[in-house]
Amino acid sequence: STMSYFAPEPSLATAAAQQAGAQAVLEEVKTMVRRLHAAGFEVILDVVYNHTAEGGGDGPSLSLRGLDNLEYYWTDHGVPQDVTGTGGTLDPRSVHTMDLVLASLRYWVQEVHVDGFRFDLATTLGRDDRGFRADHPLLRAIVTDPALRDVKLIAEPWDVGTGGWQTGNFPAPFAEWNDAFRDDVRAFWLADRAARERTGEPGIGGVRDLATRLAGSSDMFTRQDPPGLPEGRSLRAPWASINYVTAHDGFTLRDLTAYESKHNEANGEDNRDGTSDNRSFHHGHEGELPPGAPHREEIEAARRRTARSVLATLLLASGTPMLTAGDERGRTQRGNNNAYCQDNEISWVDWRR
C-alpha cells in the first residue's frame, strides 16, 4: 500500500478480512503466499517506492509528510519535485528514505516470505541531482543486502522525469521490463500488417528488429561492462529481459487485434487519457462484431491467428516471458487502454469466457 509500505492493500482482501481489521488482512496475505508456495508458485510483490498516497504539495498529510516532509520527499528549496506523474515523489537521496525502503523489503521477505519484487517506476529509485545512476546508493544497497540476496528483483525501468527511460541500464541482478520487445513484436505482427493493407508499403516493424528481440535483446542488455571484463561482455543473462506484449496498462492482447484507437470514454476524461501509440490492428473492423455481421467469421479467425502468433513469439523468445492474466482467454477491455479506474467488467477477468 502506498499509505504504508509495511501493509498490504486492504481493498484486495476478502470482505470478511477487511471487516476483521488490518491483522486479518495481513494473515490472509500470509495464507495466500503459503498456499501458492504449496502449489509450486512463487510470489512477486508489486511495490511502489517512488511515491506515496499523500500526493503533491496540496495533498493530505497522512504519514511521511507529517513526520518529516523535507527529509522523505524530493523538494527543491521546499518546492515538491515530481518525476512520477502522481506527486509525492520520494527522495532516494535521503538516508531516511533508503532505510525505509530497505526495512520494507526485508519485512516482506522475512515475515511474509514473498519471493521477489517488481519495482514500479524504478528509475526514480536510482536518481540523484545529476539524473539516473546504475550505481546509486539505494540500488547498490538493495542488490547487496543479505536479506534480499536470494529474491528476484524486477524493475519497471522508466519514470516521467528527464532521462527517465533506462531499459537495460539497471545493475545485476535486476531484471527489467523490456518495452522494446513489446513495441517491436506489436509492430511486426500488427502495426506493420495494418500499414501494408492500407498503403502497400512496409510499416514500422522489421524482421531485423524482431530477430533481435527473439535473441534476447543483446543490444540493450550488454551495456554494462563490469571492471575487468572485455568490452562487449556482461554479467547479465538473457533472463534479465522481461519480455511482454501487454501489461496492466494498455490494450489487452484481444484488443490489440480488435481496435486501432483507444476507447476510454468510460474513464470520464473525454478519451484524452491513455496512449495513442498502440501499434495494433483491428483486422478490418473496429471493435467486436455482432453475430451475423458480414465477414465476422473471417475477421475473427484472422484475429485468433494473430494472437497465437504473438503468444508464440512471446513464449519462445530468449528471456523471461510475462503474460497478462486473461490474455490466454481472449480478455477484452472493450478498447479501453487505461482501465486503472475501472473496477467492473471492463477490467475483470471473465473466467467463463
Q: Each predicted region: which residue ranges?
A:
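Residue-level signal for pocket-adjacent positions within structured domains
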Residues: 1, 67, 78, 85, ...
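Substrate-binding/active-site clefts of carbohydrate-active enzymes
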Residues: 1-114, 118-147, 152, 163-164, ...
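Conserved alpha/beta catalytic core and glycan-binding cleft of carbohydrate-active enzymes
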Residues: 113, 128, 134-325, 340
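Carbohydrate-binding surfaces of carbohydrate-active enzymes
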Residues: 295, 351-352
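Short acidic/histidine-rich active-site segments
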Residues: 324-329, 333-335
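Acyl/amide activation-and-transfer machinery of modular secondary-metabolite enzymes
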Residues: 340-351
